[in-house]
């Protein structure tokens, strides 16, 4: 067993405005879950934290559209997202909320620390004001034409088309997202500004040191922001919903009574506050995960996110933590993902493009989706979701390579050996070949997971399953049984042990199917850790690990094949196939 490590994992906080689509899932929460499961299966001390991101203009706009208060809307949507996460077997140790008191308190505290250290100041700025609405229009409350690419539905904080961050006053032909009014003025308003410029060199040094453990995508995005030069950014907004701006005594700050902190200032702080919620609810210690003078220097902190969140996590959030002057833990390893594309565009919550988590679960169980999204993870480049690709992955990898192997070997053991691990026979060339395959492939599988290369890990998992099928072709227990029962016994014994190995290594990606396999084989919980070894004989022993004479039972069919008619139906239902 490797030395136990303490690992903190966070995935980008899903925004509260509705069920997340499969692109959101594939770009943060799902790979973080797979990584958490792998680390737990190796005996490490893992804490996987996530939360709903509940502040900002989209929450207010969505609540208005439903006729609810923002609080009621967020309460309802939190439950929707929590249940969707459970449906996909996301193994959060805690799924918190940024609207809870812990996040308000910590956000206000960190802002005070930053101001004490000269990194926050009040500035008067020009902001969009809707005369007919009688209010300022921050962020997504204003829409218009992007000044960079000409996209006509750009929002005040970011253009969905080119991805550039925007200031509402930059939009061409702006209009109110609330009323549609174009009776717009530019007026002065006071806001808090985070003076990132003063942290430029420190953040550059930090990125250079930490970026060695990041994929090139994340490093390039961070360096792009740094190369362009960090600027002072407004961290307050003219909104009513959010973390209130307070003074050093915790009272409303004069002149800021109707303002809150910008959502991108408080949201990543939610990683810490959600961990505090977890600690309070479970009796655990949050400080050893987040404060380097309380043990967090011995914690590995791993973040997962889509590429659109990288700049905030590699620049803005580190400015907050490092600039506070307090011993906060910053990220060690960062995994950034590209987009999952949907027939010519990207998945989009606002435009209702693609398949959403609740819709997916109404079609098929979560393992089907988990396998396809991880085996097709958007790592080196964007990855296309297609119904045909989904069908091929399920039918080939899950139904054929894994499912048929489990079905064949367990049913044969039940019919010819009374459902018990055979006790006779001596291993031969086929078993030696299979042991060599395991000796080569199992360590490589762990290496891929350690490197957070999920497509390669899924491919290696499948390759191990495929090697097991090739082993059965070499061993031919059903042929040998006629004249050499002992020879057949060796093949069945090794085959059942392979089925257990296949179930164990499947646990991170397809946990439900893995549990069905391991339960049917009667594998105790304590024997479901990831297989490890250092010598050839360690891997040979895996083919004879289950006690001889142990009773097993064939599981039900693990995966149903996806029929062409289903692909046609789903294509029509969700609009796939239309470029």
From Swiss-Prot:
Gene Ontology molecular functions: ATP binding; metal ion binding; methionine-tRNA ligase activity
GO term, biological process aspect, one: methionyl-tRNA aminoacylation
EC number: 6.1.1.10
InterPro entries from the UniProt entry: Anticodon_Met, Met-tRNA_ligase_1, Met-tRNA_synth, Methionyl/Leucyl_tRNA_Synth, MetRS_core, MetRS_Zn, Rossmann-like_a/b/a_fold, tRNAsynth_Ia_anticodon-bd
Motif ('KMSKS' region): 346-350
Residues given in the record as ATP binding sites: 349
Residues the entry annotates as binding Zn(2+): 146, 149, 159, 162
UniProt superkingdom: Bacteria
Subunit architecture: Monomer.
Reactions listed under catalytic activity: tRNA(Met) + L-methionine + ATP = L-methionyl-tRNA(Met) + AMP + diphosphate
Pfam family membership, one: Anticodon_3
Motif ('HIGH' region): 14-24
This protein's record includes keyword Nucleotide-binding: yes
Cofactor note: Binds 1 zinc ion per subunit.
Physiological role: Is required not only for elongation of protein synthesis but also for the initiation of all mRNA translation through initiator tRNA(fMet) aminoacylation.
Chief location category: cytoplasm
Family to which this protein belongs: Belongs to the class-I aminoacyl-tRNA synthetase family. MetG type 1 subfamily.
Keyword vocabulary terms for this entry: Aminoacyl-tRNA synthetase, ATP-binding, Cytoplasm, Ligase, Metal-binding, Nucleotide-binding, Protein biosynthesis, Zinc
Species this protein is from: Hyphomonas neptunium (strain ATCC 15444)
Protein name: Methionine--tRNA ligase
Compartment(s): Cytoplasm
Cofactor(s) required for function per UniProt: Zn(2+)
